[in-house]
């Protein structure tokens, strides 16, 4: 008798995706982050659901409703901090996942890669709107500054901003709609992630060498399920340590002050995972130029496949490209640091140099390095 998991219409889908899936035998720990992102997403939806049961999306009660969750709701504090720090873990996994794709040339799977870029944008939008909900000082001013950037769009900019605000400033209408979008987007992300997975399984996983492994595949279960469980345990351990020992480590103290439209915080800055993009935005003195650079800093990922000049897929055997890749990582860390610093000398010039380096490495140096490596190997 055939196993039910291979015949039942629903079980068959699960079986083909997580049990009998043919997988390369040599994929490393860098391939764990996809499943970790799935775990993060489920965790965020669950904790978010319980927070939404107690949250009030009104400007007069939003801040106190979050305080109420932390003080009066059973284990509300742990749910709130799991959600806040879960977002940080989510972005750590996202950056690692994207970095893996860049290093090992996974971007040659065009559909999977482009859906991944859409997922990254959707996750960033969700995180931004979630940051506004506690209605602290940084929530309010972050929302004001970032939504205001749209006013740089010629002709329709001002109308667009007021349309998003639902008025002439960030107010009750803005908070309510941000809550609505923050609630619905994770479900859209879940559906998109399934499409991401569907396209991935159409072609099969890449592996560290970048060489097709079709003739040498192993089943996903038990080999990679056990590996994913190890990754999940490490992720949850890290998250629990963060939540129980230093829950406010990655947050901003200004967000413990209720939103006040009459008092601007000395330094307006987003959460740490947006600082690199914020630094790129600030490094350009022109408003529209800054907004374009901000969007392009993420959208550049979509054109990475067009810039691939090497005849090898992975960077595993390409030392020049490896050096450039790790320079890019260091540059992103520098941008993250600069994004959190005040706008004054020497931070301005460092930010401008780091921003130029970011685009120069991706658009110029990496394609050139690929061509040089081809010539060195006489290909």
UniProtKB/Swiss-Prot annotation:
Binding site for heme b b562: 83, 182
One MF annotation (Gene Ontology) recorded for this entry: ubiquinol-cytochrome-c reductase activity
GO biological process, one term: mitochondrial electron transport, ubiquinol to cytochrome c
Transmembrane segments: 33-53, 77-98, 113-133, 178-198, 226-246, 288-308, 320-340, 347-367
Entry superkingdom: Eukaryota
Binding site for a ubiquinone: 201
Membrane topology, record value: Multi-pass membrane protein
Keyword set, alphabetical order: Electron transport, Heme, Iron, Membrane, Metal-binding, Mitochondrion, Mitochondrion inner membrane, Respiratory chain, Transmembrane, Transmembrane helix, Transport, Ubiquinone
Compartment(s) where it occurs, according to its Swiss-Prot or TrEMBL record: Mitochondrion inner membrane
GO cellular component, one term: respiratory chain complex III
Other noteworthy facts: Heme 1 (or BL or b562) is low-potential and absorbs at about 562 nm, and heme 2 (or BH or b566) is high-potential and absorbs at about 566 nm.
Family as reported in the entry's similarity comment: Belongs to the cytochrome b family.
Known role: Component of the ubiquinol-cytochrome c reductase complex (complex III or cytochrome b-c1 complex) that is part of the mitochondrial respiratory chain. The b-c1 complex mediates electron transfer from ubiquinol to cytochrome c. Contributes to the generation of a proton gradient across the mitochondrial membrane that is then used for ATP synthesis.
Subunit description: The cytochrome bc1 complex contains 11 subunits: 3 respiratory subunits (MT-CYB, CYC1 and UQCRFS1), 2 core proteins (UQCRC1 and UQCRC2) and 6 low-molecular weight proteins (UQCRH/QCR6, UQCRB/QCR7, UQCRQ/QCR8, UQCR10/QCR9, UQCR11/QCR10 and a cleavage product of UQCRFS1). This cytochrome bc1 complex then forms a dimer.
The protein's name: Cytochrome b
Gene (name only): MT-CYB
């Amino acid at each position: 008798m055939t196993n039910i998991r291979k015949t039942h219409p629903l079980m068959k889908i699960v079986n083909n995706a997580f049990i009998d899936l043919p997988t390369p035998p040599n994929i490393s720990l860098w391939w764990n982050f996809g499943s970790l992102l799935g775990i993060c997403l489920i965790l965020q939806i669950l904790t978010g659901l319980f927070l939404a049961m107690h949250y009030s999306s009104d400007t007069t009660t939003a801040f106190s409703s979050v305080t109420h969750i932390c003080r009066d709701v059973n284990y509300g504090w742990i749910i709130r901090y799991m959600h806040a720090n879960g977002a940080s873990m989510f972005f750590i996994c996202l950056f690692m996942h994207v970095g893996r794709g860049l290093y090992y040339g996974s971007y040659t799977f065009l559909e999977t890669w482009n859906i991944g870029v859409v997922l990254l944008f959707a996750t960033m939008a969700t995180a931004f709107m979630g940051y506004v909900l506690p209605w602290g000082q940084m929530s309010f001013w972050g929302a004001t500054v970032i939504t205001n950037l749209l006013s740089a769009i010629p002709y329709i900019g001002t109308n667009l901003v007021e349309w998003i605000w639902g008025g002439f400033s960030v107010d009750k209408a803005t908070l309510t709609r941000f809550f609505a979008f923050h609630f619905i987007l994770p479900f859209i992300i879940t559906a998109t992630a399934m499409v991401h997975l569907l396209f991935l399984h159409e072609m099969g996983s890449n592996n560290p060498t970048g060489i097709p492994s079709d003739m040498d595949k192993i089943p996903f279960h038990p080999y990679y399920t056990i590996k994913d469980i190890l990754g999940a345990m490490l992720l949850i351990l890290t998250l629990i340590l963060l939540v129980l020992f230093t829950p406010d480590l990655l947050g901003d103290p200004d967000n413990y002050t209720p939103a006040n439209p009459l008092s601007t915080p000395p330094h307006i800055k987003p959460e740490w995972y947006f600082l690199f993009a914020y630094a790129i935005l600030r490094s350009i003195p022109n408003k529209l130029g800054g907004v374009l650079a901000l969007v392009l800093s993420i959208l550049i990922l979509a054109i990475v496949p067009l810039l691939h000049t090497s005849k090898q897929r992975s960077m595993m055997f390409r030392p020049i490209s490896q050096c450039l890749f790790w320079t890019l990582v260091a540059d992103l860390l520098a941008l993250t640091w600069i994004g959190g610093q005040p706008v004054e000398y020497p931070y301005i010039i460092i930010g401008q140099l780091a921003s130029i380096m970011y685009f120069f490495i991706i658009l110029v140096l990496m394609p050139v390095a690929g061509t040089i490596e081809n010539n060195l190997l006489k290909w």
